[in-house]
Regions:
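A short, basic N-terminal segment
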Residues: 1-41
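Residues at the beta-strand->loop junction immediately N-terminal to the Walker
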Residues: 48, 77, 128
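The conserved phosphate-sensing helix
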Residues: 216, 227-242
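Conserved NTP-binding/hydrolysis module of P-loop NTPases
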Residues: 11-12, 71-73, 81-100
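Walker A/P-loop nucleotide-binding motif
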Residues: 41-61
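Helix-loop-helix "sensor" segment of P-loop NTPases
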Residues: 115-119, 150, 159, 167-226
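Conserved Walker B catalytic segment
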Residues: 44, 114, 121-160, 165, ...
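Conserved alpha-helical scaffold flanking the Walker A/P-loop in AAA+ ATPase domains
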Residues: 34-37, 103-119
Length: 250
């Protein structure tokens, strides 16, 4: 209801804002650049952040910026993912029917990646979202997959994305040391500071096409206390309240 009241062309503070219209903090841009380097060099990276701090937005942006003529991106997000279903999920995305046994599926995937690299001259990027929910056995499989040709070459880039506990409660522990030693890059997205919160709100309002100054300095202060980029309710509540207040005064 507030879109018409404020003369908006698009709805702000929703999840389907085009990636190129999203606000990018300096930490966001730095992490995006590091992931591009990971993809190019076919490295193993881990990205963590608190819930709602922009992990999904980062992955959307990362995916949209990878040239389709140079990369094939495989994406999985399944809290119950087992090693067997990990290989099946990747092979399904490549249009192949996976073999029954895990070892056979792994070799099948490695052979297909060799074809992609050698014939299509493309690099493969595998993104595993919600990785903080995965069991140790599945996380170990990434290490085994990257043990390729006596470690002389990495067959693909692997990016594990998850909440902060992926690193703090799992990968930092001694029992995960073998996995941690294979990690080439670790990135974390922090919460926005007050200035970044104001820019974040401004980017959404610019996308909406609204020319009015809707959010006062005090409103931005209050939003900054509670907002994280993936949770849009605080600014939306203010927009709705403004409409209701003006409606009651008319």
């Amino acid at each position: 209801m507030y879109e018409a009241f404020f003369g908006m062309e698009h709805t702000p503070f929703v999840r389907d804002v085009p990636p190129e219209k999203l606000y990018e903090s300096s930490a966001f841009r730095e992490t995006l650049g590091r992931l591009s380097y990971v993809a190019d060099r076919q490295m193993f990276a881990v990205v963590t952040a608190d819930s709602g701090c922009g992990k999904s937005t980062l992955i959307r942006r990362f995916y949209s910026e990878l040239p389709k003529e140079d990369y094939i991106v495989l994406y999985l997000s399944d809290s119950k993912l087992t090693p067997r279903w990990f290989y099946k999920g990747l092979l399904d995305q490549l249009g192949l029917e996976s073999r029954f046994y895990r070892g056979d599926s792994k070799r099948q995937l490695q052979q297909e990646i060799e074809i992609i690299r050698g014939v299509q001259h493309k690099k493969v990027v595998c993104i595993l979202d919600e990785a903080h929910l995965l069991e140790k056995e599945t996380l170990e499989e990434f290490r085994f997959l990257l043990n390729y040709k006596f470690d002389s070459v990495s067959p693909m880039a692997v990016v594990l994305v998850g909440q902060t506990e992926l690193w703090e409660n799992k990968l930092k522990l001694q029992r995960y040391a073998a996995i941690r030693q294979r990690i080439d890059m670790y990135c974390t997205l922090p919460h926005l500071d007050r200035s970044e919160t104001e820019q974040y709100i401004g980017s959404h309002m610019a996308y909406s096409g609204c020319s009015q100054e809707v959010f006062t300095e005090k409103a931005v202060d209050e939003i900054h206390k509670v907002i994280i980029p993936g949770l849009f309710e605080p600014p939306v509540r203010i927009l709705r309240a403004t409409v209701l207040e003006n409606g009651s005064q008319s």
